Amino acid sequence: RCLQLEPYNEVCQYMKGLSHVAMGQFYEGIKAQTKVMLNDPLPGQKASPEYLKVKYLREYSRYLHAHLDIPLTEYNIDLDLPGNFKDHWAKNLPFLIENYEEQPGLQPHIKDVLFQNFESYKPGVQELVCVADHLGSMMQYETPGFLPNKRIHRAMGLATLEVMQAVQRTWANSKVRMNGKTRLMQWRDMFDIAVKWRRIADPDQPVLWLDQMPARSLSRGFNNHINLIRGQVINMRYLEYFEKILHFIKDRILVYHGANNPKGLLEVREALEKVHKVEDLLPIMKQFNSKTRDGFTVNTKVPSLKDQGKEYDGFTITITGDKVGNILFSVETQTTEERTQLYHAEIDALYKDLTAKGKILILSAELGEVDAVCNLILSLVYYFYNLMPLSRGSSVIAYSVIMGALMASGKEVSGKIPKGKANLTLLRFQLVDFEAMTAPGSEAFSKIARSWMNLKSISPSYKSLPSVSETFPTLRTMIEVLNTDSSHCLKKTIVVV
């Protein structure tokens, strides 16, 4: 419809190409992408976001098409795609890659994905899809700036079920096949299940492991950056967290002055008590610290469970500007090689403990064991959230792993993510990733998450669902199930409700 109204609209043309590729119609998709590529900006004209992204999408589309019918366990996108391509794509840089060898063109013998009627699936698979739709809807953020996406819901619901089944097999001492090898599952394999579903649900976004980027990129650091306030623009998604971050900054300022300016601490404290907005912090900082000039940064710390007393770098809060209306208030995590290794060691230790306790749990489902396993799952994902190891999608990927691993332990999440401030104690947050990033430790995150997850014993009917990995072993089968219309799921009785 958009192109009917404006045949040469670049955004519409790009979205047409993206939509076709997402649904497995690669020939039409790449044709539309090529039209955008031919739309070179004029000399001195700034390239549009669509023009910058389209060549990455075309190359990725070719790769996906070539792998449509190859079992997903036999290859690895992070290892297959060239390092510089991944680095430039994740950073949204112009496609200027030296010695880049294009992906092969579309092969005629590999056909596009055909539409699959819901009724053509066996009853068990239909039930699987309906359950996935329900589970995926539980991950929706009910906050301004986050619109529901039913395709993502289904993909991450299926990811949750596949994680559940894979973790159960691991605790029963079964091996999994990943990247062409059969072995015991590690924590990254667990997250990779969710990664593959998130990738195929929206091929527009580069969902890539940052530690698999080229060494040069890692040595410089890879930043996940979020602007909270930029000039007159306020990021509504994170508005609920402004007050919490403001209190944290005030505390850090007091600690700093307590160590470096103890005589002036009372005056600083009195001045900070009058500050109720982030924008008002800059004048205060300039007044009491000549080094502040046009801005300052505050770093958060993440306490280790493995090594008591040790702390890791969390995220950095930056406030710059010279007056109200010209302020930049942002947060970012810097993924360096050293920081990544520290977090990996923490997650490795938690996963080892989780696997050991999971194996005991299968033999003896005592309440104490279940509780310990639940806390380990939430602690492990707490460090994943703070590491932010993916270029995109870390939040929903981590949450689907939480839900799937909890289901493997015999518990399921029945409570939805809260809409906002229900009261002044527990039910006050909206974004699970930001709650983990601003929590003082893994125990605090586990406590507040469990307060609204409303964990209950899992329905026995989950055991009768078919294997997700065996039912959808290729990209083609994954795209087919994401495309299928399941509107009559609403008319059926879903096993989980």
Q: Where are each of the predicted segments found?
A:
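Canonical positions in the second alpha-helix
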Residues: 2, 35-36
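FIC/Doc superfamily catalytic core
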Residues: 53-497
